[in-house]
Amino acid sequence: MSRKKAVILVSGGLDSTTVIAIARSQGYDCYTISFDYGQRHRAELKAAEITAKAHGSLEHKVIRLDLGAIGGSALTDTSIDVPEEETSGIPVTYVPARNTVFLSIALGWAEVLGALDIFIGVNAVDYSGYPDCRPDYIAAYETMANLATKRGIEGERLHIRTPLINLTKAQIIQQGLALGVDYRLTVSCYQANDGGEACGKCDSCRLRKQGFEQAGVADPTRYAF
C-alpha cells in the first residue's frame, strides 16, 4: 500500500518546520516547497532547505517569484522599515496576496504529484494579524481548490491542512520538541543577517522569544547582538 503524499509549504521558520514534523508523524511522504519572493534576506531559504532535509523531505523545490515588483510590504521593500514595536491593525510586514500565491503554486505541484493534502503553518493565535492566516481564509481557499482542480471536480477532495491554526506559540514549540524538531536550525526573524542571526526586535522575534519563555524551554535562537 502506497503512503499518502503531501506538499508542505516551508519558510525555514519555527512554525513551518514543526508542520513538516507533524506531517511525517501522520504517515505522509513529504514534498516541500519554498519561495524566493524578493524577501529581505536569503537566510530563511537556506534554513528551509536544511530543515526540509532534516525531516525527510523526498523533494524540495524553491520557486522564484518577484512579489517585490508590486511592493506594499516591509518584507519586500527596503524603503519600508520593519517595525520593532508592537502595532495595532494589519502590520506593514503583511505581504499582499502572499499565501494565496504560495498556496496556488503548491496546489499545482500537488496535482502533478497526485497529492490530496497541502500543509501550511498558518496560526491564528500568536500571530501578527495577517488576513491570510485566518481559519475563514483557509476554508474559503480549500473550497476554491476543489472547484479549480481536475481531481477536485472528479470527486477526490483536496485538503488544506493547518495543524497549528489554533495553537499558541508555546504549544507549537512543545509539540515540535516532542517530535524531535531542532529549533536551532530555524530562522524566524524578518530581518535576519546573512548568517541567520536574528534582530531580536521585530514582531516575529518577539513572538518566538515569548513562545520559548512560555513553553519553559531555553531559547536556541542565535541573535546578532
Curated annotation (Swiss-Prot):
Pathway: Purine metabolism; 7-cyano-7-deazaguanine biosynthesis. InterPro entries: QueC (IPR018317), Rossmann-like_a/b/a_fold (IPR014729). One of its GO terms (biological process) is queuosine biosynthetic process. Disulfide bonds: none annotated. Binds 1 zinc ion per subunit. Its cofactor is Zn(2+). This is 7-cyano-7-deazaguanine synthase. It comes from Cellvibrio japonicus (strain Ueda107) (Pseudomonas fluorescens subsp. cellulosa).
